[in-house]
């Protein structure tokens, strides 16, 4: 019993410490940052799904979309030449050194590809949806390189909440007036992504 009581107290202390740290890390505005979810459908078919960092997360989103009967194509190395008749670009953010290696591209090359693709999409009036669905496992130096540039150009964002415990994506969306829906897991994508399409 004593051991159990000590464990509970140590966990409670860790919980308090984490809460204090998040307040210190977030600064003055982050704790007050409010972001609304998507109020009405903004996207149109067909969609082009690509990776932002070459993790396999984009393939999981494609599987969900296929099961929902959504009209889309996937291309993990898409450039402006691949936009075709796409009316929506979905960029699934998550860095993977293994995925980058398999694609024959480094992080800087991936950032340049995404910048070129997203600028072309913006110029063509294509709706951009940023997704971060890998949770906490898809955070860290590599993945974080891709989050800011992708979210800054997005029209809408979907985030698995465990991947945004520091509020980075929420803050980016608030700063850019981008609607963002937080979900508990990748399986919850079905409750928000199809509803984004007209």
Task: For the regions a language model picked out, list residue spans one by one.
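A short, gly/pro- and small-residue-rich
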Residues: 101-125, 172-180
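Short, charged N-terminal beta->alpha structural module
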Residues: 42-67
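N-terminal, intrinsically disordered, polar/charged segments of Gram-positive cell-envelope systems
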Residues: 17-40
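Ser/Thr/Gly-rich flexible loops in soluble cytosolic domains mediating phosphotransfer, phosphorylation
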Residues: 110-144, 186-198
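A short, well-structured beta->alpha microelement
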Residues: 65-85
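Structural recognition of alpha->loop->beta junctions
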Residues: 140-171
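Short acidic-hydrophobic, aromatic-tinged amphipathic segments that line or gate anion-handling sites
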Residues: 160, 179-185
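C-terminal motif of bacterial Sec signal peptides marking the signal peptidase cleavage site
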Residues: 9-13
């Amino acid at each position: 019993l004593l051991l159990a009581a000590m464990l509970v107290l140590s966990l409670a202390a860790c919980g308090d410490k984490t809460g204090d740290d998040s307040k210190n890390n977030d600064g003055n505005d982050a704790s007050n940052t409010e972001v609304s979810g998507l109020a009405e459908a903004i996207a149109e078919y067909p969609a082009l799904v690509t990776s932002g960092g070459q993790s396999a997360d984009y393939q999981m989103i494609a599987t969900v979309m296929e099961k929902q009967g959504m009209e889309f194509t996937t291309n993990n190395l898409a450039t402006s030449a691949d936009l075709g008749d796409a009316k929506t670009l979905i960029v699934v953010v998550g860095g993977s050194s293994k995925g980058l290696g398999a694609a024959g591209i480094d992080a800087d090359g991936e950032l340049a590809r995404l910048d070129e693709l997203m600028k072309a999409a913006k110029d063509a009036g294509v709706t951009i949806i940023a997704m971060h669905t890998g949770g906490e496992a898809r955070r860290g130096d590599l993945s974080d390189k891709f989050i800011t540039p992708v979210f800054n150009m997005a029209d809408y964002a979907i985030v698995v909440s465990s991947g945004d415990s520091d509020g980075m994506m929420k803050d980016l969306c608030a700063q850019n007036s981008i609607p963002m829906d937080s979900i508990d897991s990748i399986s919850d994508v079905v409750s928000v992504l199809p509803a984004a399409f007209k």
